[in-house]
Each structure stands twice: as C-alpha cells, then as structure tokens.
C-alpha cells in the first residue's frame, strides 16, 4: 500500500520544518524552513558544534552577524540534502522596521552568495507585518524571493498577494490553539479554524489568479495536514512526516484550483491595520510569535556571544 506521505507528495510539495539536517536527510522533503526557534534547537545538537564555532570567527564581536552566519551555515548544510530551497528568517526584532529588514535580508543573501549558493535556492522569511510586507515587496522587485511568515489573518494574506510576494506561510496549529483556549472546543476536521483559514486563503488566491504560493504551516496533528491535502505546499515537522509515512490509509484531496473564492480585494495601510485590530486572534498570535522568535534570537545570540 502507498503511504499517505507518498499520496500527499503527488498533489502537494512537502517541506520539512526543521533545522536538523539529519532529520531532513531521513524524511527527504523538497524544501526546508528554519526560524530562530529551530536554529536555537539546532545549536544544541552536538553535531553542530563545529559549525557554531566557525560562525563566530572574524565577526569582530558582532553577534548579529555571527547569528546570520549560523543561519546561513545551517541552510547551506540543509541544501546539500534537499533538491529545493531553504527559508532563512530575518531577525524578528526588526519586524516593524522596513529598512532594517531590507538591510538584514541583503546581508543574508550576500552570505549565501559568498557560500556559492544562488538566490534561486533561498527564500527570505519575514514576519507578515505591514512593514514586513513592504520590505518583501521591494525584495521581490530586486529578484529576491520571500516567504511571509506568522500569517494568521485574511487581511495579511490579501496584502501579501497585492505585494506580489513569492510565498506565504499561513499558520494552522497556532490558530487552532487560540480558538481551543478561547472556546474550550476541540475542533476536528473541516471545523478546525486553522484549516478553515488556509482553505479560505487558498481559494481566494486561486479564484483571483494570484501566483503567490500558499504553504500551510504549524501543524498539531495529522488530521490538519490531511484536511489541507492539495495545498501548494505544506511545511511539516519531521515527526509528523514520519507518521504520514507510516500510515497506509487513503488520502483524499481537499484543496484544488477552480473552487469558488472571494472577489479580489485591496487594502491600504489604514484598512490593513483596522482589519488586524478587529481580529483579536491574529493580533495576539502575531505579537506572541514575534516575541517568541525575538526571545529565541536573543538566546541564540547569547550562546554565540559566549564564543566570541
């Protein structure tokens, strides 16, 4: 029998959500994504010690540069075992500063370039704030493709599409977490608010012929993944990928182009901010996500600073 993983791979590009290249080599995804939290976990893996030490050389005390070098070094290793692309994230503490995000994105691309890795194999991850979307819009015009992360609302998805970003990462599990805590309900199947969010965005993009790739992210269980079978891409943790590989049940396609979606919309900054303000879940989860990534960035930098 064909596993659910193999069935999924026929209709969706499977991406590994991890910085552990041993796990990536084991599950064999097309692409991989990292973030500050995953890099912090990777830094604790004994096999990464030499990589971590090498990243602090010649940094002249610049812990931010050392951190970027580590992110790129991890990406470089991952690219040795995947055929596709690596997503590397801009420092979350810059999420409300367009120019600072642009500078950091350019530095990441420069570091990849020095390592002999072309921009066609890299996606720059940026938080889906208004400022982040504006930075991504400029990067796309420069030929640097982006992955807009921490996306929790339809307004964020609309703004990203209008900006022409290459890919968005709408979160499923964190939306589910918020609604479960707020209501006490344990949502299942198509009733899951995270699943509903990604489905709505996917249908909207396809109905309006947006080229932006929809990559569902942040999964809590296999059912959430199965409910989004057919999505352009899904970024999944290695443990859930392995569970899919062990399941030989039938996988039904849930998402496909051609279904009815909402009419094309456009949001200016004031409209975007108002829509965000009206969405308590998205406001709270975006702020929480940025704070968590920022704290993990600081922990990673403290680890690197001790080696400088």
Curated annotation (Swiss-Prot):
Catalytic site positions: 125
A biological-process GO annotation: carbohydrate metabolic process
GO cellular component, one term: cytosol
Reactions listed under catalytic activity: D-sedoheptulose 7-phosphate + D-glyceraldehyde 3-phosphate = D-erythrose 4-phosphate + beta-D-fructose 6-phosphate
Keyword Cytoplasm included in the entry's annotation: yes
Keywords assigned by UniProt, alphabetized: Cytoplasm, Pentose shunt, Schiff base, Transferase
First and last residue of the signal peptide: none
PROSITE patterns the UniProt entry points to: TRANSALDOLASE_1 (PS01054), TRANSALDOLASE_2 (PS00958)
Family: Belongs to the transaldolase family. Type 1 subfamily.
Function of the molecule: Transaldolase is important for the balance of metabolites in the pentose-phosphate pathway.
NCBIfam families linked: PRK12346.1, talAB
Name by which UniProt lists this protein: Transaldolase
Biological source species: Pseudomonas fluorescens (strain ATCC BAA-477 / NRRL B-23932 / Pf-5)
């Amino acid at each position: 029998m064909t596993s659910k993983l193999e069935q999924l791979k026929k209709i969706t590009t499977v991406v590994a959500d991890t910085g552990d290249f041993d796990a990536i080599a084991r599950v064999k995804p097309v692409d991989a994504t990292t973030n500050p939290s995953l890099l912090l976990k990777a830094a604790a893996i004994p096999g990464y010690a030499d990589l971590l030490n090498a990243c602090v050389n010649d940094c002249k005390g610049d812990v931010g540069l050392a951190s970027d070098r580590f992110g790129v070094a991890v990406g470089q290793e991952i690219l040795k075992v995947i055929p596709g692309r690596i997503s590397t994230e801009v420092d979350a503490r810059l999420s409300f500063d367009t120019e600072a995000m642009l500078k950091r994105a350019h530095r990441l691309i420069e570091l990849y370039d020095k390592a002999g890795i072309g921009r066609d194999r890299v996606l720059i991850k940026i938080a889906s704030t208004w400022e982040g979307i504006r930075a991504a819009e400029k990067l796309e015009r420069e030929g640097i493709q982006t992955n807009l992360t921490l996306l929790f609302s339809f307004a964020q998805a609309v703004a990203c599409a209008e900006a022409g970003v290459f890919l968005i990462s709408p979160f499923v599990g964190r939306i589910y977490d918020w609604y479960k805590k707020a209501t006490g309900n344990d949502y299942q199947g198509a009733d899951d608010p995270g699943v509903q969010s990604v489905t709505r965005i996917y249908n909207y993009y396809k109905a309006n012929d947006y080229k932006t790739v929809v990559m569902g992210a942040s999964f809590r269980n296999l059912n959430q993944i199965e409910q989004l079978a057919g999505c352009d891409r899904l970024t999944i943790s290695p443990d859930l990928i392995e569970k899919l590989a062990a399941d030989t049940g039938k996988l039904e396609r849930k998402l496909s182009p051609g279904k009815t979606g909402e009419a094309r919309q456009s949001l200016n900054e004031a409209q975007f901010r108002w829509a965000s303000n009206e969405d308590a879940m998205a406001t709270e989860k975006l702020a929480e996500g940025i704070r968590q990534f920022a704290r993990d960035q600081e922990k990673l930098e403290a680890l690197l600073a001790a080696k400088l």
